[in-house]
Amino acid sequence: MIVILDNGGQYVHRIHRSLKYIGVSSKIVPNTTPLEEIESNKEVKGIILSGGPDIEKAKNCIDIALNAKLPILGICLGHQLIALAYGGEVGRAEAEEYALTKVYVDKENDLFKNVPREFNAWASHKDEVKKVPEGFEILAHSDICQVEAMKHKTKPIYGVQFHPEVAHTEYGNEILKNFCKVCGYKFE
């Protein structure tokens, strides 16, 4: 099972449905859920930090990003929370928009296996990662955002600014499936 921490984003239920579509069970929990409670459930194989409107109401996710022993995928706000947890910088986007964006994959990696080097993704660019934390590397960028995706160099921690769970994102299910593979799921 994948635990989805609900940061109040409008697409949290889309994450749940997208995982169900690819055959992975998931559970949406409040973003105040303690890490010990999540990790004490032996069925949990990974954590997704959802998008949301307010960093201040999602501070527990910083503790989870720093201390979880499970793989983590941060989406939009979740991505930004991972950056903050590890000492990166988040700020207002120069091009504040909510639209389809062409994403360019800079580095082959587990998250973008079987995904083209360029694809269209639905993205919210109100805030974004301005500086990648030490120990992380940029995996993808767009013309309006230099950090569309990042990964910790030694831990299975990923962040994406765009929304793989939204139907408009090409290869979104493939990206979610790739994260689930990192968590130990097998697909035919």
UniProtKB/Swiss-Prot annotation:
EC number of the protein: 6.3.5.2
Catalytic activity: XMP + L-glutamine + ATP + H2O = GMP + L-glutamate + AMP + diphosphate + 2 H(+)
Chain ranges of the Glutamine amidotransferase type-1 domain: 1-188
InterPro entries in UniProt: Class_I_gatase-like, GATASE, GMP_synth_GATase, GMP_synthase_A
Pfam families: GATase
Highest taxon listed in the record's lineage: Archaea
Annotated active site: C76, H163, E165
Protein name as annotated: GMP synthase [glutamine-hydrolyzing] subunit A
Gene name linked to the record: guaAA
